[in-house]
């Protein structure tokens, strides 16, 4: 009550921001008359003028109003479109590094041109991030006319582009691309062997379109570059037979022994998307595995040597119980292709990790591809947090505003629409069974068809969309289906979806990127006609002219019928996804309507509210086919959705807390790698490493400040000769000297090592040897970093068990990960020094061949796969929504601020940098 009163008196934070923006809009409008009087050349030269003003000390905020006015005027001349005041407000929010929530049809693509142009004036580059290649290319081509008019270069970063083209795209003032490409480019840039191989040039400013989809929905699925690992094809085939021998338990056993409706060998936790063996299931699984030849008789499934086998068992169970064909994946041309849960699109070339994809391939009887080893990985959360300034646009962000602020420090600003929406959102209708629900859906579609109203039916899976299509076929109602199997016709189907009597069935993929225009999208339909090679030029012109003449009457007809009607056949776990479906209707003040038809069989209701609602229906003695339609029921469903959203937020936050540990180590490792790449000669670094390593070796046999009786000189001589390539006589020298202390022995060893090193340099030449040293260090760093990533992954999978010992798993993970990183640095130091000291050199050409060989080995990593990990395997013991596989690529390196020797180490150990990660340098 008090908060509400304060908001009434002083306005909400959103209201105050909009008030500030309106003041800037007045300034933008004030520039308009003078800019209108300029010719095209004079208007375009404003770009050079702005750059000079920035160089003279003015800030972007100082020139923002005039720059926005220039873009608005240029848009009028080039695009024949003038930015609305709402778009100016959205542009200001984006420039300030906030999320602008703007409804469907409000022109987010045009809005972005304002802050993109302004921030591109700095010359540091602006990244415009979209969800797929089609939108990236479309928006770049569409808006490049405006940017080119103003003297800005535009690049497009698409998958499968060659190296030179990518470099050119990143060198442009403005670069459009997908979140996947930007992320994978970052990782690839940190795997290069030469500075010239990098493509990115910095992470200054990014605007993320459909920011909720990228930073929320895909946040839990790390980007992974992986290479071939050990082949376990036969094992997958054997274990695929196991689930058919096991019975599913119905109900979870509680602490008091109740809860099990039907005993079985395993039970499925649908909330956490995990499968667990029961006590009887363990015994039965072991017996079956022995019969299958996968387990030795008498061995336990939990024996240390069978950890990998256990991993395969659970992967097979999850593949058979949780991952469904035509819902989570499709099988095409003998391949298992993942369906993106959030967009409904096929994820060509993307694979689930941790053996899950191979388990699904075994289940479907298709060829099993080899497993992969992680070479580099990062989450979207940590990638996008590296940008100097980050902003985003979407039509549905307010429900996730807390998470955006908590994780990314991004404030959400709700921009008022240019025209108030007239869409009517009707109460949900809930039925006892799916059959009754679909009967009601078909009846609603028939009613709309009879009055000429276009309908968009939203489904959550390919299977459901095809079921509705079959029901409509029986009623002889014409319709279009848009799902991952028909994605190639997406543009054509969406262009027609707003025409009278059109029935469009779509999975979530129809929800983003393209507006449904009432009466049909004339521009899109015209381009489709123009692309039809079967028509002559005269026929094309005639059809396009006819289309334009008919459009207004068709548009008016659709308006009179009530606009686009949205039918949702199921509630999604997230309210935001439901709002996206609703948002397809009522664009720019158009009329429209929406309604969700639900069933007690739906996963959301079954898991969170099914029993309670079923009891209500039975008490009310509701007849078959009669729905519940009440505000209190709709609110209870939204309450269940909020619970799921809260749980998923906790999981994403937990993932981030774990990944932050690896992220600190990743940044430090990449920083070290960059120093090596950027240094013309790392001789001083090698000398420091050599001294550190040999001092440590000597201290084992000749402890510091020890007595002569404690020395093992013979052992030191042997180890230096056998492992470090140094032949030295210490025992006779010590016996013949009057007095020798431990420091003199160390100095003698170091001096001999330096002489040996100098001799190799003299023989090969400084330039050749410097190249060899760089290759050795990069090879060791990259190979051991890959092993370290695997070690961190294994550590994370089991760390939750520390909770049973009353220890904080996250703190334990941080501590042990730091210890592993310390071991990594020591191994790298020893590896590098040993390689350089033991190399036998006969000529400079031999040394060059050795360098090329190591570089070739690393270059083989270019034959890699890009994937998202399955998030349910990312944090063992966690619960969460199912993740999707996704396509991605890498960006440039951010070296970050230089760390002083006495500053706290950025890896989080609490030690000084010089005593921790800085020890390597």
Curated annotation (Swiss-Prot):
<dbReference type="InterPro" id="IPR020937">
    <property type="entry name" value="SecA_CS"/>
</dbReference>
<keyword id="KW-0813">Transport</keyword>
<keyword id="KW-1278">Translocase</keyword>
<dbReference type="InterPro" id="IPR014001">
    <property type="entry name" value="Helicase_ATP-bd"/>
</dbReference>
<dbReference type="GO" id="GO:0005829">
    <property type="term" value="C:cytosol"/>
</dbReference>
<comment type="subunit">
    <text>Monomer and homodimer. Part of the essential Sec protein translocation apparatus which comprises SecA, SecYEG and auxiliary proteins SecDF-YajC and YidC.</text>
</comment>
<keyword id="KW-0479">Metal-binding</keyword>
<feature type="binding site">
    <location>
        <position position="916"/>
    </location>
    <ligand>
        <name>Zn(2+)</name>
    </ligand>
</feature>
<keyword id="KW-0862">Zinc</keyword>
<dbReference type="InterPro" id="IPR044722">
    <property type="entry name" value="SecA_SF2_C"/>
</dbReference>
<dbReference type="GO" id="GO:0017038">
    <property type="term" value="P:protein import"/>
</dbReference>
<feature type="binding site">
    <location>
        <position position="907"/>
    </location>
    <ligand>
        <name>Zn(2+)</name>
    </ligand>
</feature>
<dbReference type="InterPro" id="IPR001650">
    <property type="entry name" value="Helicase_C-like"/>
</dbReference>
<dbReference type="Pfam" id="PF07517">
    <property type="entry name" value="SecA_DEAD"/>
</dbReference>
<feature type="binding site">
    <location>
        <position position="87"/>
    </location>
    <ligand>
        <name>ATP</name>
    </ligand>
</feature>
<dbReference type="InterPro" id="IPR014018">
    <property type="entry name" value="SecA_motor_DEAD"/>
</dbReference>
<dbReference type="GO" id="GO:0005524">
    <property type="term" value="F:ATP binding"/>
</dbReference>
<feature type="binding site">
    <location>
        <position position="515"/>
    </location>
    <ligand>
        <name>ATP</name>
    </ligand>
</feature>
<dbReference type="Pfam" id="PF07516">
    <property type="entry name" value="SecA_SW"/>
</dbReference>
<comment type="function">
    <text>Part of the Sec protein translocase complex. Interacts with the SecYEG preprotein conducting channel. Has a central role in coupling the hydrolysis of ATP to the transfer of proteins into and across the cell membrane, serving both as a receptor for the preprotein-SecB complex and as an ATP-driven molecular motor driving the stepwise translocation of polypeptide chains across the membrane.</text>
</comment>
<keyword id="KW-0547">Nucleotide-binding</keyword>
<dbReference type="InterPro" id="IPR036266">
    <property type="entry name" value="SecA_Wing/Scaffold_sf"/>
</dbReference>
<dbReference type="InterPro" id="IPR011116">
    <property type="entry name" value="SecA_Wing/Scaffold"/>
</dbReference>
<dbReference type="Pfam" id="PF01043">
    <property type="entry name" value="SecA_PP_bind"/>
</dbReference>
<feature type="region of interest" description="Disordered">
    <location>
        <begin position="575"/>
        <end position="594"/>
    </location>
</feature>
<dbReference type="InterPro" id="IPR036670">
    <property type="entry name" value="SecA_X-link_sf"/>
</dbReference>
<keyword id="KW-0963">Cytoplasm</keyword>
<dbReference type="GO" id="GO:0031522">
    <property type="term" value="C:cell envelope Sec protein transport complex"/>
</dbReference>
<dbReference type="Pfam" id="PF21090">
    <property type="entry name" value="P-loop_SecA"/>
</dbReference>
<dbReference type="GO" id="GO:0046872">
    <property type="term" value="F:metal ion binding"/>
</dbReference>
<comment type="similarity">
    <text>Belongs to the SecA family.</text>
</comment>
<dbReference type="GO" id="GO:0043952">
    <property type="term" value="P:protein transport by the Sec complex"/>
</dbReference>
<keyword id="KW-1003">Cell membrane</keyword>
<keyword id="KW-0997">Cell inner membrane</keyword>
<dbReference type="GO" id="GO:0005886">
    <property type="term" value="C:plasma membrane"/>
</dbReference>
<keyword id="KW-0811">Translocation</keyword>
<dbReference type="Pfam" id="PF02810">
    <property type="entry name" value="SEC-C"/>
</dbReference>
<dbReference type="InterPro" id="IPR011115">
    <property type="entry name" value="SecA_DEAD"/>
</dbReference>
<protein>
    <recommendedName>
        <fullName>Protein translocase subunit SecA</fullName>
        <ecNumber>7.4.2.8</ecNumber>
    </recommendedName>
</protein>
<dbReference type="InterPro" id="IPR000185">
    <property type="entry name" value="SecA"/>
</dbReference>
<feature type="binding site">
    <location>
        <begin position="105"/>
        <end position="109"/>
    </location>
    <ligand>
        <name>ATP</name>
    </ligand>
</feature>
<keyword id="KW-0653">Protein transport</keyword>
């Amino acid at each position: 009550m008090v908060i509400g009163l304060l908001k009434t008196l002083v306005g909400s934070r959103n209201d105050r921001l909009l008030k500030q923006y309106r003041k800037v809009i007045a300034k933008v409008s004030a520039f308009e008359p003078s800019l209108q009087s300029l010719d095209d050349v004079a208007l375009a030269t404003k770009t050079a003028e702005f750059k000079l003003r920035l160089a003279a000390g003015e800030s972007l905020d100082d020139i923002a109003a005039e720059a926005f006015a220039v873009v608005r005027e240029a848009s009028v001349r080039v695009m024949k479109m003038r930015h609305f005041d709402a778009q100016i407000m959205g542009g200001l929010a984006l420039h300030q590094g906030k999320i602008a929530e703007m409804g469907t049809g409000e022109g987010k693509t045009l809005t972005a041109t304002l802050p993109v142009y302004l921030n591109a004036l700095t010359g540091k580059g602006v990244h415009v991030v979209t969800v797929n290649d089609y939108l990236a290319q479309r928006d770049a081509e569409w808006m490049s006319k405006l940017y080119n008019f103003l003297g800005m270069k535009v690049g497009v970063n698409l998958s499968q582009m060659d190296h030179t083209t990518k470099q050119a795209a990143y060198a442009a003032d403005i670069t459009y691309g997908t979140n996947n490409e930007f992320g994978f480019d970052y990782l690839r840039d940190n795997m290069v062997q030469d500075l010239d191989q990098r493509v990115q040039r910095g992470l200054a400013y990014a605007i993320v379109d459909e920011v909720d989809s990228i930073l929320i929905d895909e946040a839990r699925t790390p980007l992974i570059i992986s290479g071939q690992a050990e082949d376990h094809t036969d094992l997958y085939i054997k274990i695929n037979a196991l689930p058919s021998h096991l019975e599913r338990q119905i109900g979870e056993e509680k602490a008091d022994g109740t809860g099990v409706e039907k005993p079985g060998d395993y039970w499925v936790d649908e909330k956490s998307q995990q499968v667990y063996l029961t006590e009887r299931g363990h015994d039965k699984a072991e017996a079956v595995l022995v019969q299958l030849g996968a387990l030795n008789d008498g061995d336990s499934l939990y024996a240390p040597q069978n950890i990998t086998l256990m991993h395969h068992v659970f992967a097979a169970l999850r593949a058979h119980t949780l991952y469904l064909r035509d819902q989570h994946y499709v099988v095409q041309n003998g391949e298992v292709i993942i369906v993106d849960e959030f967009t409904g699109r096929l994820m060509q070339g993307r694979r689930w990790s941790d053996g899950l994809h191979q388990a699904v391939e075994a289940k479907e009887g298709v060829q099993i591809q080899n497993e992969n080893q992680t070479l580099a990985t990062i989450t979207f959360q940590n990638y996008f947090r590296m940008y100097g300034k980050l902003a985003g646009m979407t039509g549905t962000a307010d429900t996730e505003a807390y998470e955006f602020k908590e994780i990314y420090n991004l404030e959400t600003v709700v921009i008022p629409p240019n025209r108030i929406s007239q869409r009517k959102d009707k109460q949900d209708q809930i039925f006892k069974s799916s059959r009754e629900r679909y009967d009601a859906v078909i009846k609603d579609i028939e009613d709309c068809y009879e009055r000429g109203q276009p309908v968009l039916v939203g489904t959550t899976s390919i299977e459901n969309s095809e079921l509705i299509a079959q029901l409509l076929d029986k009623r002889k109602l014409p319709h279009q289906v848009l799902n991952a199997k028909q994605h190639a016709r997406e543009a054509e189907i969406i262009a027609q979806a707003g025409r009278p009597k059109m029935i469009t069935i779509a999975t979530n993929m129809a929800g983003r990127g393209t507006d449904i225009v009432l009466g049909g999208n004339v521009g899109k339909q015209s381009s489709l006609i123009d692309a039809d090679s079967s028509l002559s030029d005269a026929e094309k012109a005639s059809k396009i002219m006819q289309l334009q003449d008919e459009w207004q009457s068709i548009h008016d007809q659709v308006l009179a019928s009530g606009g686009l009607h949205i039918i949702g056949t199921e509630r999604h776990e997230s309210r935001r996804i439901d709002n996206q479906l609703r948002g397809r209707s009522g664009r720019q003040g158009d009329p429209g309507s929406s309604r969700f038809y639900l069933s007690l069989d739906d996963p959301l209701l079954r898991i969170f509210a099914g029993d309670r609602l079923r009891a209500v229906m039975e008490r009310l003695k509701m007849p078959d086919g009669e729905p519940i339609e009440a505000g209190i029921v709709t609110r209870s469903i939204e309450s269940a959705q909020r619970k799921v959203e809260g749980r998923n937020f906790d999981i994403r936050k937990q993932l981030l807390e774990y990944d932050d540990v690896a992220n600190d180590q990743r940044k430090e490792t990449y920083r070290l790698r960059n120093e090596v790449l950027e240094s013309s000669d790392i001789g001083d670094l090698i000398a420091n490493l050599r001294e550190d390593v040999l001092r440590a070796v000597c201290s084992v046999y000749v402890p510091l400040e020890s007595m002569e009786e404690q020395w093992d000189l013979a052992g030191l001589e042997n180890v230096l000769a056998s492992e470090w390539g140094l032949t030295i006589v210490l025992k006779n020298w010590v016996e013949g000297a009057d007095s020798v202390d431990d420091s003199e022995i160390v100095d003698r060893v170091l001096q001999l090592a330096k002489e040996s090193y100098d001799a190799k340099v003299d023989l090969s030449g400084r330039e050749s040897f410097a190249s060899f040293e760089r290759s050795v260090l990069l090879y060791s760093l990259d190979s051991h970093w890959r092993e370290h990533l695997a070690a961190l992954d294994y550590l994370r999978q089991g760390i939750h068990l520390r909770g049973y010992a009353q220890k904080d798993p996250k703190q334990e993970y941080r501590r042990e990960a730091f210890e592993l990183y310390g071991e990594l640095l020591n191994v790298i130091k020893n590896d590098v020094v040993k390689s350089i000291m033991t190399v036998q050199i006969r000529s400079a050409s031999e040394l060059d061949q050795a360098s090329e060989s190591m570089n070739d080995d690393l270059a083989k990593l270019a034959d890699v796969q890009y994937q998202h990990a399955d998030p349910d395997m990312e944090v063992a013991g966690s619960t969460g929504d199912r993740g999707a596989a996704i396509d991605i690529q890498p960006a440039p390196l951010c070296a970050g601020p230089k760390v002083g020797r006495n500053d706290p180490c950025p890896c989080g150990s609490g030690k000084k940098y010089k005593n921790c990660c800085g020890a390597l340098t």
